[in-house]
Amino acid sequence: MPTIQQLIRSERSKAKKKTKSPALKQCPQRRGVCTRVYTTTPKKPNSALRKVARVRLTSGFEVTAYIPGIGHNLQEHSVVLIRGGRVKDLPGVRYHIIRGTLDAQGVKDRKQGRSKYGTKKPKE
């Protein structure tokens, strides 16, 4: 327990908050270029082929980002927008690609939850 004199000499240091998405550099989204598009398998007990991409960001970082939804048109040199948000069963994947912006097209034939997958309202 410090004395009052010690507290006057040097105040208590605030605990620094560690960000969960450092590559965004405090921005809500970042633009980047895909360097590799591939599939990977999740941790136990899940089993699938999850679509992910290595993305070189404008902030200088190279990160792994998840491609949500069924089917995608991304390939090497595609320009994408990424947001924060990890994928729980893929270690090291802390970002999501935003569908329906830049080169990432929205999910085809999506009827519900369209805004999350960049799909326009279907004509009736």
UniProtKB/Swiss-Prot annotation:
CDD domains associated with the record: Ribosomal_S12 (cd03368)
Keywords: Methylation, Ribonucleoprotein, Ribosomal protein, RNA-binding, rRNA-binding, tRNA-binding
Cellular component annotations (GO), alphabetically ordered: small ribosomal subunit
Membrane-crossing residue ranges in chain numbering: none
Region (Disordered): 1-28, 101-124
GO MF entries: rRNA binding; structural constituent of ribosome; tRNA binding
Residues carrying 3-methylthioaspartic acid: D89
Chain intervals with Basic residues compositional bias: 113-124
A matching Pfam family: Ribosom_S12_S23
Gene Ontology biological process: translation
InterPro entries per the UniProt record, alphabetical: NA-bd_OB-fold (IPR012340), Ribosomal_uS12 (IPR006032), Ribosomal_uS12_bac (IPR005679)
Disulfide links within the chain: none
Superkingdom of origin: Bacteria
Role played: With S4 and S5 plays an important role in translational accuracy. Interacts with and stabilizes bases of the 16S rRNA that are involved in tRNA selection in the A site and with the mRNA backbone. Located at the interface of the 30S and 50S subunits, it traverses the body of the 30S subunit contacting proteins on the other side and probably holding the rRNA structure together. The combined cluster of proteins S8, S12 and S17 appears to hold together the shoulder and platform of the 30S subunit.
Quaternary assembly: Part of the 30S ribosomal subunit. Contacts proteins S8 and S17. May interact with IF1 in the 30S initiation complex.
Family in the record: Belongs to the universal ribosomal protein uS12 family.
Protein name: Small ribosomal subunit protein uS12
Species this chain originates from: Crocosphaera subtropica (strain ATCC 51142 / BH68) (Cyanothece sp. (strain ATCC 51142))
